[in-house]
């Protein structure tokens, strides 16, 4: 799934569809950041990032915590994610 695939869900009048789209977007972004960090750590980037790996890892940790919050809400609210 790509970010563009989540657009219909984000535009839906149904909050459960918007919720699912938000979860999907965050998951996609977190996975891409995780891949980026791995490539950064192993010198596989074609450029030198300005941000430190530590700051990017902090961002990823927060994104993962946000994903966990959304998963807990999904259970409570009966929204199917993943």
Regions found by a protein language model. Give the residues of each.
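Extended, charge-rich alpha-helical interface modules
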Residues: 2-82
């Amino acid at each position: 799934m790509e970010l563009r695939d989540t657009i219909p869900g984000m535009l839906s009048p149904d909050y459960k569809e918007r919720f699912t789209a938000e979860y999907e977007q965050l998951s996609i972004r977190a996975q891409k950041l995780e891949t980026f960090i791995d490539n950064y750590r192993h010198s596989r980037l074609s450029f030198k990032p300005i941000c430190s790996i530590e700051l990017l890892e902090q961002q990823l940790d927060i994104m993962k915590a946000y994903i966990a919050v959304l998963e807990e809400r999904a259970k409570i609210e009966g929204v199917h994610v993943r």
